[in-house]
């Protein structure tokens, strides 16, 4: 659609050029080419930001940060895990690292030059009966890319080869030996 929609409630005495900030973020993510049909330089930016309700603001504004309220809150759930130093479940941590490295490779533009912004990854780990990771069963990576070969099967084969031979080794090096052994 070529649109960015900003929505929410804000209480501030500062002017922010939210349209330009949104465009800068879209460009920083990597949407910079007309071929993507979405670019920070040409997208529409719709701002639905309005002043925070007085009722919520009364619960938030305090003289010190120790007294600061949380305002309007969303609900979420999750859990911490001792599988990783950052307390994220191991499969999610590996997925995040895959996407971080894929984005770094896209920005570098040298090893895999056809990558576009927007990707997702999923990792499935096989566990023993006592919940000890045994091996990585499956890694799925889906990424937007430039069309670089005429035949789809050849393009898919190249992408798969690059993910396995170029991306995954970079990811493996980020982990301690006991996690590297799972790959």
Please state what every model-predicted region is.
Residues 1-12:
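Short, charge-patterned binding micro-sites
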Residues 12-26:
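Active-site-surrounding "flap" and adjacent substrate/cofactor-binding loops of secreted or lumenal enzymes
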């Amino acid at each position: 659609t070529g649109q960015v929609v900003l929505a929410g409630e804000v209480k501030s005495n500062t002017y922010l050029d939210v349209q330009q900030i949104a465009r800068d973020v879209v460009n920083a993510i990597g949407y910079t080419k007309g071929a993507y049909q979405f670019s920070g330089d040409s997208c529409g930016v719709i701002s639905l930001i309005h002043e925070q309700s007085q009722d919520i603001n009364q619960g938030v504004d305090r003289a010190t940060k120790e007294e600061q309220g949380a305002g309007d809150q969303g609900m979420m759930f999750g859990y911490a895990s001792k599988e990783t130093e950052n307390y994220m479940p191991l499969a999610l941590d590996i997925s995040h690292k895959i996407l971080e490295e894929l984005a770094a490779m896209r920005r570098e533009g040298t090893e895999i030059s056809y990558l576009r912004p927007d990707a997702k990854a999923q990792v499935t780990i096989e566990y023993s009966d006592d919940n000890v990771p045994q091996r990585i069963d499956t890694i799925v990576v889906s990424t937007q890319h430039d069309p670089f070969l005429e035949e789809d099967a050849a393009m898919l084969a190249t992408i798969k080869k690059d993910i396995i031979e170029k991306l995954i080794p970079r990811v493996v090096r980020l982990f301690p030996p006991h996690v590297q052994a799972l790959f």
